[in-house]
Amino acid sequence: MTRSVCALLCALAVAWPAVTRAEEPDWDKRFHTQVQQWMKTIVERDPQFRDWTNARIDAQSLGANQHQWLVSVTRDGRQVGYMVVGESPAPGKQPTFVLLEYGVGEYILFDDAFAPRAVAAEPVYDGFASHWLVARQEHRELVDAKTGEAYPASVASGPPVITTLPDSELARPEERLTAARVLSGAVQDPFDRIGWLNDTSHRRQVTWTDLWQKTTSGPVTLTVPLFQSDVLAPFAVQSLHLWNGHAAYVGVWDEGLRFVPYAYAMKVGQFHADDTTSHKTSSLPD
């Protein structure tokens, strides 16, 4: 399924990040080590990431002074995934690295192949609303960071959401992926069943427990109003990850499997499930 923004409207690329601080001579090493640790635990727990084994990583800074980095994962010259790492302030201590997003497949965020040409484009990361900001003479244009599609000129970005998440909702240093579950092994197109288009304002909210304990084969769709609801983007939910029993991530299909924090997904979107019936004996992993 190819997501189109028109469907619904309403090396280390710069060595290790060129933001290394003189007062933190070990920053590069800490960053590199942490990324490798996260990659290792993902590969060990989820076979969908097997191509990450013995993969090469390159990183680049996302925007000036944003404290966010895109990590490109390649193996044998092929793109096999990516991670987005943030840096969270810690009073009196070194800033803490946090895992904002990660994905597997040949398409990553802010791929040079899809970058706007012949114009200056600034990468802006904010989960599903990630985009290149292109300053044209007559207006500002937003270009989707995953597909390279330009949004209509009327679309404007809002305040970032993913940076408002508390660290407790994100994977942090030394934490491991402790549980993984595949809801659907086959790629699903949310447009095959469009019940999510109906008014669902009175439906019960689908919780993390509902998702994890789901025993039926019906699809789960996450709908996300983007850019002040000018765009409605539906995503098929494929997998679930749980880090150290507290940080939950939802894997959706978006030109590849893309994991974002569950807390972020709940802030920006709504889950739709045909049936979230679960066995009474089911339990969440520790």
Per-segment meaning from a language model:
Residues 23-63, 103-121, 167-223:
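Short, non-transmembrane alpha-helical segments in secretory-pathway proteins
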Residues 83-129, 143-179, 254-286:
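A short, surface-exposed interaction/processing loop segment used at functional sites
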Residues 177-286:
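A eukaryote-biased signal for long
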Residues 22-33, 75-84, 91:
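N-terminal short leaders/motifs
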Residues 16-22:
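Sec/Tat signal peptide C-region and signal peptidase I cleavage site
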Residues 47-89, 125-142, 240, 251:
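Exposed beta-strand-loop-beta-strand "reactive/processing" segments of non-cytosolic proteins
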Residues 7-15:
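Bacterial N-terminal signal peptides
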Residues 1-6:
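Bacterial N-terminal signal peptides that target proteins for export
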